[in-house]
Curated annotation (Swiss-Prot):
Disulfide bonds: none annotated. GO terms for cellular component: eukaryotic 43S preinitiation complex; eukaryotic 48S preinitiation complex; eukaryotic translation initiation factor 3 complex, eIF3m. The gene is eIF3f2. Keywords: Cytoplasm, Initiation factor, Protein biosynthesis. Residues 12-150 form the MPN domain. The lineage of its organism: Eukaryota, Metazoa, Ecdysozoa, Arthropoda, Hexapoda. Component of the eukaryotic translation initiation factor 3 (eIF-3) complex, which is involved in protein synthesis of a specialized repertoire of mRNAs and, together with other initiation factors, stimulates binding of mRNA and methionyl-tRNAi to the 40S ribosome. The eIF-3 complex specifically targets and initiates translation of a subset of mRNAs involved in cell proliferation. It comes from the Eukaryota. One of its GO terms (molecular function) is translation initiation factor binding. PANTHER family: EUKARYOTIC TRANSLATION INITIATION FACTOR 3 SUBUNIT F, EUKARYOTIC TRANSLATION INITIATION FACTOR 3 SUBUNIT F-RELATED. InterPro entries: eIF3f, EIF3F/CSN6-like_C, JAMM/MPN+_dom, MPN. This is Eukaryotic translation initiation factor 3 subunit F-2. One of its GO terms (biological process) is formation of cytoplasmic translation initiation complex. It comes from Drosophila mojavensis.
Amino acid sequence: MSISNYRLQTRVRLQPLVLFQIIAAYERRPKTAKMAVGTLLGRRDRCNDIIEITNSYTVQHKEQQIGDMEQFKLDTQYASEMFELNQVTYPQEKIIGWYCTGKTLSRSAAALHGYYSRECGDMQPLHLLVDTSLRGGRLTTRLYCAVTMGVPGGTRGLLFTLLPLLKVNAEGDEAVALRLMQKQALHPTKQLGRMLPELVHVMEATRELEQKLDLVMRYINDVLTRKRRPDNSIGRALHDALTSVPLLDADSFRAMFNANVRNMLMSITLSSMIKTQMELSEKLSYLPDH
C-alpha cells in the first residue's frame, strides 16, 4: 500500500473545540500518565490541499519504564469503539491522525504513527503536539507529518517534519464563545472564577445590536439627506439583511422571545446538573475500593 506524503502547501484548519478537548483530556488524565493521547477526526478535500480538524477523543494508554526502555501500549479496542460511536453521530468525520501533550515528540511517536497509518488508509496521519505547560502564557501547538526516508533497498525510517501552516478556524458560535472568553480574561468580574450570568450576556449582545442599528440608521439618514454618497454594495447588504428577518407583529415577537428565554434557562439548569453529576462521579472514582 502506497502512502502519499503531505505537501508543504497543505493548509490545516483547527477548530478551537479540539484544543479544549485536549486540555480537558490532559487535566483528567490518570495520575500515573505523563501525557494525554487521543485520535484526531476531521475532513479533507479530494486534492488534499485543505484539511480541517473538527473533533477528537481520548484514547486510554499505559506507559511503563523498564530500565532504559520505555514501553507504550495503546488501548486499540477502546479507540475502535469510540470511533464507531462517533460515526453514528458524525459519519462525515474520518480519522486523520492523533494528538499528544508535551513539549517535544515522545519516543512513542513512531509506534503511534504505525497504528494510525493503518487507521487513516492511504493517507499519512497528522500528529498534533500540544504543550499544555503554557510557557510564556501561551498554548503552543505544533503539527507534524512523518516523511519516509532511507537508502533504497536498505533500512527505512521516519522523519517528523513540521507542517508550516496551522490555522485556527473560528466561525459562528465558536467565534462568539471565544470573544466572550477573551473579554472575561481582559476584564474579569469581581467574583473571580465565575462567568457572568447568561442573561447578562443577552443584555450585552442586545446593547451591541442597538449600537449597530444606530450606526446603520445614521448611514441611511446621511444618504437620504445627501451628506454621504450611496454605496450599492452596502445597500444590497442591508436589503439582504432586512429581507432575511421574518415580519412579525409585536405580540408574536414577544411570545417567541419569551419561549427562547425559557428554553435557555432550562438548558442552563440541565447543564448545571450534568456538571455537578460529573464532578461527583470524578471524585467518587478516586475513592479506594473496600
